[in-house]
């Protein structure tokens, strides 16, 4: 597999090839995922929960995201490396640009921001200055206290229409990739068909252009609570390398996620 770019991902969408993404936080696992064909590696602020033991992602700092980006980049040859902008690091266009520049200097090739059309000015500012952007709608973990917990979004008609509208607005502002998290399958399918850019789902059903999982969930390494949309691939294979190979295969074939992993 050659080096993955946003152009490659767009072509995959156009040709109906599914995109496999997974979180990574260090060089060792980044190399494993890269070797087994993952197209996108996300340095997620989920590290605040799965690595640091926090109850949410809000305490993760820019310095920590820069550090983990450097680690992942060292283990990656082909996959597109995307890094989360942490909580309160993109309140204004100029602040967004300064922080995104740090992540790009650390080796990221795209940054991800959570939120709707209030981000459009910052997205335009980044894209004008050479920084590719991934959007994130639905359940946005940095807004967990606004939502009152980690809950499925877009189940009523008003909320679904708002998420759909915001997806179009973010695309118009310049995002090149969109993550949809914990939304009904029907809404994710509608958005995926409406957008020209690739849509990556997590808890969003099988009709998106690709899937992403937190690596700990894919290996069944949890602290007790197991999200409905996850699958323990390690339990099926008994080997980490084989587990990721199976994940990539099932995403590519469209057999993951199954009905049991979806929200209606």
Swiss-Prot record:
Catalytic activity: 3-methyl-2-oxobutanoate + (6R)-5,10-methylene-5,6,7,8-tetrahydrofolate + H2O = 2-dehydropantoate + (6S)-5,6,7,8-tetrahydrofolate
Keywords noted in UniProt: Cytoplasm, Magnesium, Metal-binding, Pantothenate biosynthesis, Transferase
A Pfam short name: Pantoate_transf
Keyword Transmembrane: no
GO cellular component: cytoplasm
Cofactor(s) the record lists: Mg(2+)
GO molecular function (one): 3-methyl-2-oxobutanoate hydroxymethyltransferase activity
Positions with a binding annotation for Mg(2+): 45, 84, 114
Entries under InterPro entries matching the protein: Pantoate_hydroxy_MeTrfase, Pyrv/PenolPyrv_kinase-like_dom, Pyrv_kinase-like_dom_sf
Gene Ontology BP annotations: pantothenate biosynthetic process
Compartments where located: Cytoplasm
Top enzyme category: transferase
Main localisation: cytoplasm
Parts forming coiled coils: none
Assigned EC number: 2.1.2.11
Cofactor detail note: Binds 1 Mg(2+) ion per subunit.
Active site as annotated: 181 (proton acceptor)
Highest taxon of source: Bacteria
Annotated pathway: Cofactor biosynthesis; (R)-pantothenate biosynthesis; (R)-pantoate from 3-methyl-2-oxobutanoate: step 1/2
Family statement drawn from the similarity comment of this UniProt entry: Belongs to the PanB family.
Assembly: Homodecamer; pentamer of dimers.
The protein's name: 3-methyl-2-oxobutanoate hydroxymethyltransferase
Organism: Aeromonas hydrophila subsp. hydrophila (strain ATCC 7966 / DSM 30187 / BCRC 13018 / CCUG 14551 / JCM 1027 / KCTC 2358 / NCIMB 9240 / NCTC 8049)
Gene: panB
């Amino acid at each position: 597999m050659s080096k993955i770019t946003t152009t490659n991902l767009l072509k995959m969408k156009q040709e109906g090839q599914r995109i496999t993404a997974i979180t990574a936080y260090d060089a060792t696992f980044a190399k494993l995922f890269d070797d087994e064909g993952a197209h996108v590696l996300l340095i997620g602020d989920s590290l605040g929960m799965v690595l640091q033991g926090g109850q949410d992602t809000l305490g993760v700092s820019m310095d920590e995201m820069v550090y983990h980006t450097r680690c992942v980049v060292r283990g990656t040859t082909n996959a597109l490396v995307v890094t989360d902008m942490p909580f309160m690091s993109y309140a204004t266009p100029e602040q967004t640009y300064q922080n995104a520049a740090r992540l790009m200097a650390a080796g990221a090739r795209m940054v991800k921001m959570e939120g709707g059309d209030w981000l459009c000015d910052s997205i335009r500012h980044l894209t004008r200055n050479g920084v590719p952007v991934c959007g994130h709608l639905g359940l946005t973990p940095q807004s967990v206290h606004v939502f009152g917990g980690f809950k499925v979004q877009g189940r009523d008609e008003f909320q679904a229409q708002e998420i759909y509208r915001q997806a179009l607005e973010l695309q118009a502002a310049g995002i090149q990739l969109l993550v949809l998290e914990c939304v009904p399958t029907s809404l994710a399918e509608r958005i995926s068909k409406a957008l020209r850019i690739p849509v990556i789902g997590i808890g969003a059903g099988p009709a998106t252009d690709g899937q992403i999982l937190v690596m700990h969930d894919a290996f069944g390494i949890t602290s007790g609570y197991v999200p409905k949309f996850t699958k323990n691939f390690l339990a099926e294979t008994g080997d980490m390398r084989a587990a990721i190979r199976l994940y990539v295969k099932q995403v590519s074939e469209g057999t993951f996620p199954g009905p049991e992993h979806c929200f209606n």
